Amino acid sequence: MAALTDLSFMYRWFKNCNLVGNLSEKYVFITGCDSGFGNLLAKQLVDRGMQVLAACFTEEGSQKLQRDTSYRLQTTLLDVTKSESIKAAAQWVRDKVGEQGLWALVNNAGVGLPSGPNEWLTKDDFVKVINVNLVGLIEVTLHMLPMVKRARGRVVNMSSSGGRVAVIGGGYCVSKFGVEAFSDSIRRELYYFGVKVCIIEPGNYRTAILGKENLESRMRKLWERLPQETRDSYGEDYFRIYTDKLKNIMQVAEPRVRDVINSMEHAIVSRSPRIRYNPGLDAKLLYIPLAKLPTPVTDFILSRYLPRPADSV
């Protein structure tokens, strides 16, 4: 058994050290670089010597990132919910990479809110999240694929453990399940072009995707706009307990995001990137096992975590 463990370790070590050549000449385009994973990845790839094309949502974020890095990083503005913005960014990337193409596209831009019990949300709440996390990701990918194919590079899509098991209502898990399906389908389609597609499925990390507004205030707004009949069916205790549970989840969220950034980097620089990366102990020990259990078992476990509504049977 010890020998098998050693062989497994050596195999993983070899794969992790088996890097692509000429990294300093390769271009990487990353969305969502104002803060969080995208911002840190951009800086880490610059330190590695790669040519980084970073897309930010705000001018402030763009200027700050440019100040914090070197000439190897260039920034542009991108709103992934607007087709014209995506087209402009694609042309900007095309002008930068030229005939060599784009080595890696990293679809990192994302939002997590609004989230909550599905019945408390509106269609617009779902659309707001899905347009960024899924539709925007798809449109960016479609515009960048010719350049990635030219370089025989890779696409790295930011999903989530919530793309394997739906642990919360709202558009977040819905969009991440969509990211998984889209990534799986294009990975198979692009195989013969020599393009690899990787999916990052982090556990619960503390990033700006959770928003700046106080959680209880956000949940109170959702609660107070509900019809009285709906509020009565859940009860005030449900609202209080549900909100407290969300607070607890956020409080135990992992603040050290280095594992996520290293996973993203490995997907970009390794000759043998993995199809899926699951950074975070909660991803490995909780969410992925829950996703693999029989559905009735997963339902039983997760439903026991939810509070019981006033009108429960």
From Swiss-Prot:
Main location per the UniProt record: cytoplasm
Pfam families, sorted: adh_short (PF00106)
Entries under InterPro entries matching the protein: NAD(P)-bd_dom_sf, Sc_DH/Rdtase_CS, SDR_fam
Distribution of this protein across tissues and organs: Expressed in the skin. Expressed in granular and cornified layers of the epidermis (at protein level). Highly expressed in liver.
GO cellular component: cytoplasm; intracellular membrane-bounded organelle
Effect of residue 72 to W: In ARCI13; decreased protein abundance
Location within or outside the cell: Cytoplasm
Family (UniProt): Belongs to the short-chain dehydrogenases/reductases (SDR) family.
PANTHER family in the cross-refs: SHORT-CHAIN DEHYDROGENASE/REDUCTASE FAMILY 9C, SHORT-CHAIN DEHYDROGENASE_REDUCTASE FAMILY 9C MEMBER 7
Noted disease: Ichthyosis, congenital, autosomal recessive 13: A form of autosomal recessive congenital ichthyosis, a disorder of keratinization with abnormal differentiation and desquamation of the epidermis, resulting in abnormal skin scaling over the whole body. The main skin phenotypes are lamellar ichthyosis (LI) and non-bullous congenital ichthyosiform erythroderma (NCIE), although phenotypic overlap within the same patient or among patients from the same family can occur.
Name of the protein described by the UniProt record: Short-chain dehydrogenase/reductase family 9C member 7
Protein's organism: Homo sapiens
Gene name, Swiss-Prot/TrEMBL: SDR9C7
